[in-house]
Amino acid sequence: MLDDMLARMLNQIHHGDCIAGMNGMPEGSVDLVFADPPFNIGYEYDVYEDSRSRHEYLDWSRAWIAAAHRVLKDDGTFWLAIGDDYAAELKLLSQEVGFHCRSWVIWYYTFGVNCKAKFSRSHTHLLYFVKNPAKFTFRADLLENRIPSARQLVYADKRANSIGRLPDDTWILRPQDLEGCFSADEDTWYFPRVAGTFKERAGFHGCQMPEQLLGRIIRFCSNEGETVLDPFSGSATTLTVAKKLGRRFLGFDLSLEYVQRGRDRLANFQVGDPLAGAAEPTASAPATPGKRASKARPTTIANTKAATKTPALSAELPFENELIDAFANTSQSFSPASLR
């Protein structure tokens, strides 16, 4: 039976500091925490100061992570989204508080932030922790949590495991991999960063997460009817996805504007509504219009396999065809004697 205090807090966004808010919650009352805190990189929020000293930021991070650890159930799960600057430090802080790291996931988007004096930033770290490594929720049994293997996705091989496989720990997005486009991947996930032109963008928060990404996390690490907490509600994407997937939810935010807009967003959706954005991966390769490779191309083991098993790739991926040709030429000239 739900604690009366928790029951009064559920299915709402609360205006206020998340540390004070979580410290006011019953201990061990939440099943999943997803946190996307400020990165301390000088982003202009309307209330929060995102340019703290390193020492102050880490002390503050330890405080809210400890509060999240306290409210999680013994079999609860904690996900932390963070940028490069403090990913390693916050991983160590989380472990010092008592969390156990299961995976360090990289969410990679190829249309990232352009930089002039360093390599462009095009990824975010997603740290996956559990409170008790001997008892936690990970729904590998759900068909909706599995993805087609390379045999299924690229080759349509009937010998492939019909239930697919579990995703790996690299989640990738390129603009050409949005809905309606073919993704010839074997072991990567494709999720868009929510750009300003995307339909699912809430329009009032510059750091919005995609619903499909949160959907995968919530489906894997919680069950229907369980409670999801977001200490930094922001655009309310975590809570919106939790609601759509039939979870109880609650969140905190310092910004009254974000709280009000998040509440408005939540009011527009019901349990069972579809998640925004393109589901991935594509179930099969669509037919590709256009000419196939030239018949004059020399027949080799490499390019014959490409032409017979993946015709869609021949027209769509000229760079890959160049690699196939290069490999074929190399294999023709290779002999054991060349190694002597």
Regions found by a protein language model. Give the residues of each.
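Short, flexible coil/linker elements and helix-boundary hinge sites characteristic
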Residues: 268, 330-331
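Core catalytic lobe of class I
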Residues: 1-261, 301, 306, 317, ...
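S-adenosyl-L-methionine
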Residues: 2-22, 263-304, 308-323
